[in-house]
């Protein structure tokens, strides 16, 4: 499920992520100011490369390219309409689909709300839910959607404010001007405002959003049909998932009446039909340098995958001692398996010699263009080498960076926080680490003082696994190894640390927080003693890493400026979890020596369940067994397209040229995962729930005629 990756921030997102939300109100245009070079399209750009994909921004749509490829170039009214009909959840995409504020997204995007509104004696995630009337719709605590109102270029203003001579100075100045622009925007408009860095700093845009904070759950199917096939089918196709949920936006305690919403297509999209996906892709690395990709291939991703394997092994060890642990860790296991598949796919793309040759050829050509111009060479020519040197140095101390920390144990993490709170609280606010300034410090203290359950066997296995891995990668003389193991085996050290600590006791943690630096310094709790030793090691490697990453950020911004100066908007920028429109077609593909069809049907759902004897994860909710005869089994269920998506696109609408909703994006196939770095459309596919399948299920399985009629405008 693609959104789960977008929530995991081990992947660098190129957007400036500070967002300011306002509450005042004044009229604001819903227009989009065209980006510089917006008229430049792939057909006229120098050396356009299709491996950069089709995640187009709304201020630079490639109209000439669309006209030539699909015989269709939408006007500004069409673009404004579909932009305003699309809304962003905190971790997903979604869209207005009725004049009464219905919002369509994925089941897994609404999971938090579904869990929160479930009654004590039931769980809507397992049972499903369909509101019989407006009064039955359940308010989702803390959930909101953002509607993109306008886009304004602010590149010149941002660059004018960055005058520093060192990467650290430039980073501070960049953060300051971004914060100022966002605050001014909030104060003058009352909207939620975000300055977005595109082309790695080659271009900056101010995105203004209207936020709707009263959302209510209208309908959600059972998780078993929403994610039918579980991990074995995740990132695969053919699929048979009803991964959908319906929310409703309210305004002043009444259903919202949006001016722009997507009308429903009863027939959906057919084979070969052009479709557009509108959503908020989270993060891609197509503009990364070759050195950055090689670091991820050789260092970053292998370490990440090893960490996932350790975490899964720890859970399995815990389950072997406690049979009830399987249910407790079910979601965590699925998340780890999901992430493992994704990162394995990312790395597969970087191991692929043909893809890397493509990247090398583009970078060589790009650098040659820069070096051919004396002015560009003087400004940007050394940036690639600076990035490569910084990446090399990061690789040299990567093991220390990963192990000189306080995770993944909850007990050790709390000990580390306690030690750090004591140290930082004694400093003036401006001198503290950024994460401990202002109200953040009080929030950390409050979190430490709250009761929380501790799984002791899990903690022992977790610490032992981390120490064992550190022992394998760090030399015996390493200061972390000396203080953490102290001559013991990883298992013996973990046993002593967990058995001897009182960090699981909220009252004990509270006494240390209230006692401050003196209490922490005097404590002989084994985890506090260890955390006191780790803290200076961690500060050193983090400071070194921050310094190198500042060099990388400064130079990748220069590369982004160089890229933009040559290619303009003819190449789409990397994903930034902001609204994009991607073009593609409905199309099957060759797989496993045969051909995958462009669509699946309900016939296939029951065939796949039957082939696995209806055993988990191929079992069906009871209503899907007893009500099978109600369905028209030939109805399309899921389908695939060549659109360009990644994590964050979950819940995106797929629309036709009439701006009608034909599908709901929920995943990509396994071949799609390497598209994170270089896009291809030969076998990678986007997977969507078919609009006809959604209506068929709502009417026949969930007695949801009220809801279906609203969707279909009846």
Region locations from a protein language model:
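Terminal presequence/propeptide segments associated with secretion/organelle targeting
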Residues: 2-5, 9-10, 14, 18-714
């Amino acid at each position: 499920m693609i959104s789960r990756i977008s929530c995991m921030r081990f992947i660098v997102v190129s957007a400036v992520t500070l967002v300011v939300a306002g509450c005042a109100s004044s009229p604001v245009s819903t227009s989009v100011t065209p980006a510089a070079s917006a008229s430049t399209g792939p057909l006229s750009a120098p050396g356009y490369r299709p491996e950069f994909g089709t995640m187009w921004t709304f201020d630079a749509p490639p109209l000439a390219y669309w006209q030539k490829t699909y015989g269709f170039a939408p006007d500004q009214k069409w673009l404004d309409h579909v932009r305003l009909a699309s809304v962003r959840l905190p971790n997903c995409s979604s869209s207005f689909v009725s004049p009464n504020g219905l919002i369509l997204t994925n089941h897994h995007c609404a999971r938090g709300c579904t869990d929160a509104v479930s009654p004590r004696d039931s769980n809507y995630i397992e049972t499903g839910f369909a509101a019989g009337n407006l009064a039955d719709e359940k308010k989702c605590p803390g959930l909101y959607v953002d509607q993109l109102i306008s886009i304004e270029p602010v590149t010149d203003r941002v660059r004018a404010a960055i005058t520093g001579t060192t990467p650290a100075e430039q980073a501070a100045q960049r953060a300051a001007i971004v914060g100022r622009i966002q605050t001014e925007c909030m104060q003058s408009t009352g909207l939620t405002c975000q300055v977005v860095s595109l082309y790695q700093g080659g271009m900056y845009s101010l995105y203004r959003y209207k936020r709707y904070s009263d959302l209510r759950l209208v309908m959600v199917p059972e998780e078993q049909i929403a994610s039918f096939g579980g991990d074995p089918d995740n990132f695969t196709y053919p699929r048979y998932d009803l991964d959908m949920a319906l929310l409703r936006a309210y305004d002043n305690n009444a259903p919202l009446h949006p001016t722009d919403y997507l009308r429903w297509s009863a027939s959906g999209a057919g084979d070969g039909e052009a479709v557009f996906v509108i959503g908020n892709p989270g993060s891609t690395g197509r503009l990364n340098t070759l050195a950055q990709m090689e670091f991820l291939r050789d260092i970053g991703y292998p370490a990440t995958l090893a960490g996932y394997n350790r975490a899964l092994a720890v859970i399995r060890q815990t389950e072997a001692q406690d049979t009830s642990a399987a249910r407790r860790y079910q979601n965590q296991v699925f998340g780890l398996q999901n992430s493992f598949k994704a990162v394995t796919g990312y790395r597969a793309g970087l191991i692929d010699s043909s893809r890397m040759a493509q990247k090398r050829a583009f970078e060589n050509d790009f650098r040659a263009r820069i070096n051919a111009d004396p002015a560009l060479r003087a400004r940007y020519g050394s940036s690639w080498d600076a990035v490569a040197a910084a990446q090399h140095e990061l690789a040299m101390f990567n093991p220390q960076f990963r192990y000189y920390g306080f995770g993944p144990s909850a007990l050790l993490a709390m000990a580390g926080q306690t030690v750090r709170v004591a140290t930082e609280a004694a400093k003036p606010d401006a001198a503290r680490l950024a994460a401990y300034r202002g109200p953040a410090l009080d929030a950390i203290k409050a979190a430490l003082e709250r009761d929380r359950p501790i799984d002791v066997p899990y903690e022992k296995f977790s610490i032992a696994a981390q120490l064992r891995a550190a022992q394998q990668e760090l030399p015996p003389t390493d200061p972390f190894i000396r203080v953490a193991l102290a001559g013991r085996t990883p298992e013996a050290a973990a046993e002593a640390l967990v058995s001897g600590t009182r960090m699981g006791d909220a009252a004990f943690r509270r006494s240390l927080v209230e006692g401050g630096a003196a209490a922490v310094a005097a404590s002989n709790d084994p985890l506090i003693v260890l955390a006191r030793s780790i803290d200076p090691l961690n500060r050193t490697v983090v400071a070194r890493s921050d310094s190198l990453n500042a060099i990388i950020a400064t130079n990748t911004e220069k590369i982004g400026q160089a890229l933009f100066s040559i290619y303009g908007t003819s190449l789409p920028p990397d994903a930034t979890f902001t609204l994009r429109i991607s073009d593609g077609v409905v199309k099957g593909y060759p797989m496993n020596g045969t051909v995958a069809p462009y669509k699946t049907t309900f016939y296939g759902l029951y065939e796949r369940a039957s082939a696995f004897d209806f055993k988990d994860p191929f079992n069906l909710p009871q209503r899907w067994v007893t009500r099978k005869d109600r369905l028209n089994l030939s109805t399309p269920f899921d389908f695939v397209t060549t659109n360009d998506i990644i994590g964050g696109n979950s819940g995106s609408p797929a629309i036709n040229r009439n701006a009608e909703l034909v599908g709901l994006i929920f995943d990509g196939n396994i071949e799609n995962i390497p598209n994170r770095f270089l896009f291809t459309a030969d076998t990678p596919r986007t997977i969507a729930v078919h609009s006809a399948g959604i209506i068929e299920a709502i009417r026949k399985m969930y007695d949801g005629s009220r809801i279906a009629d609203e969707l279909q405008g009846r």
